[in-house]
Curated annotation (Swiss-Prot):
This is Methylthioribose-1-phosphate isomerase. It comes from Paramagnetospirillum magneticum (strain ATCC 700264 / AMB-1) (Magnetospirillum magneticum). The record marks C162 as: Transition state stabilizer. The gene is mtnA. It comes from the Bacteria. It is an enzyme of class 5 (isomerase). It catalyses: 5-(methylsulfanyl)-alpha-D-ribose 1-phosphate = 5-(methylsulfanyl)-D-ribulose 1-phosphate. The active site is at D242.
């Protein structure tokens, strides 16, 4: 995607061929800062501290983290240590484990001296694959938006939650890829952007992306979506996912479940965009089996913003002594999902639907 006319991905190899560079997303929307990653520890910190986030981008960063680790120690023990360090950073996004498993499978059969070059090559492939998958699912999702426009012959209003745009992936995004593809094809649309507390990733990241791309959008408080749906102001919802089970349960940013309930009650289609590495074929019941990350309560009790003098500051929004809890994700049962938008097409959120698109997993 482009920022002020310059094409960017969210992660890329620096000119030295060894250092990896990322956009520090904790500094957005007010600052655009590129950060170099030169070691396994740098990569792990970038994931844990959410300089990068979004399931596909976490996976891509972990892949490059493995490559960086081989510069210091490409032995079997070194690979195992790197795997464990990176795997421990964030528990919910399945792309993290998927990417690490891909790297181990590619590297362990090779002689130690050949592993570093192979690691960088496989990490680059994972990034390219993610971009291609997201572009493809974007086309499938854009067809859904086009069908709504054809039926209603007016601007289509789409509600999204958190950030599942290109900042959450290597490029294009998941939930936002259909929006970008449809917008670029000339379909009139407007996006309702949930602010997505407590980290405000909708207000800070999704709005920033849509602004860069010129897509009409409006930021709303998290609890506004139901009201909009009741009054016919939402034509469809499209969200992303950090892990989707083989039965079609969808784990995504906290608050997604409530949007799906409101959509169901108001007959608003609720779609989920995901590349296939986000499917966890080993898990059936998302509510019971997916580990839900619990983050620092400080994210709930404090908030960042830009003051009138242009300084970005953190302020406390809760009383001293009030405890807070900060679950990062929730699970939307498959019965509330209209369809899953993947790189192979759109399917029902069910074992049969997923196996129809991915028969090799049957």
């Amino acid at each position: 995607m482009k920022i002020n006319g310059t094409p960017y991905r969210t992660i890329w190899l620096a000119k030295d061929g060894r250092t990896v560079e990322i956009i520090d997303q904790t500094r957005l929307p007010h600052e655009f800062v590129v950060v170099p990653l030169a070691s396994l520890e740098d990569a792990a910190k970038s994931i844990k501290d959410m300089w990068v986030r979004g399931a596909p981008l976490i996976g891509a960063t972990a892949a490059y983290g493995m490559a960086l680790a081989t510069l210091a120690d490409a032995s079997d023990a070194g690979l195992e240590r790197a795997y464990q360090v990176l795997h421990a950073t964030r528990p919910t996004a399945i792309n993290l484990k998927w990417a690490l498993d891909e790297m181990i499978a590619a590297l362990t059969p090779l002689p130690v001296p050949e592993r570093s070059a192979a690691a960088y090559a496989r990490a680059a492939e994972i990034c390219d694959e993610d971009s291609a998958q997201n572009a493809a699912l974007g086309e499938h999702g854009a067809a859904i938006i086009a069908a709504h426009h054809k039926a209603k012959n007016r601007t289509i209003n789409i509600l999204t939650h958190c950030n599942a745009g290109w900042l959450a992936t290597v490029d294009w995004g998941t939930a936002l890829a259909p929006i970008y593809k449809a917008f670029d094809a000339g379909i009139p649309l407007h996006v309702w952007v949930d602010e997505t507390r407590p980290r405000n990733q909708g207000a800070s990241l999704t709005a920033r992306e849509l602004n860069w791309h010129g897509v009409p959008h409006t930021v709303i408080a998290d609890n506004t979506g139901g009201h909009l749906m009741q009054h016919g102001m939402v034509d469809l919802c499209i969200v992303g996912t950090d892990r989707t089970t083989r039965n079609g349960d969808v784990c995504n940013k906290i608050g997604t479940y409530l949007k799906a309930l409101a959509a169901k009650d108001n007959n608003v289609p609720f779609y989920v965009g995901l590349p296939s590495p986000t499917i966890d074929w080993n898990v059936a019941d998302g509510v019971k089996e997916i580990p839900i990350e619990e983050r620092s309560d400080r994210e709930q009790t404090h908030i960042f913003g830009k003051t009138e003098d242009g300084v970005v500051r953190e302020v406390q929004v809760t009383p001293d002594g009030s405890p807070a809890v900060n679950y990062g994700f929730d699970v939307t049962p498959a019965r509330l999902v209209t369809g899953l938008i993947t790189e192979r097409g759109v399917c029902e959120a069910s074992p049969e639907g997923l196996k129809g698109l991915f028969p090799e997993r049957a």
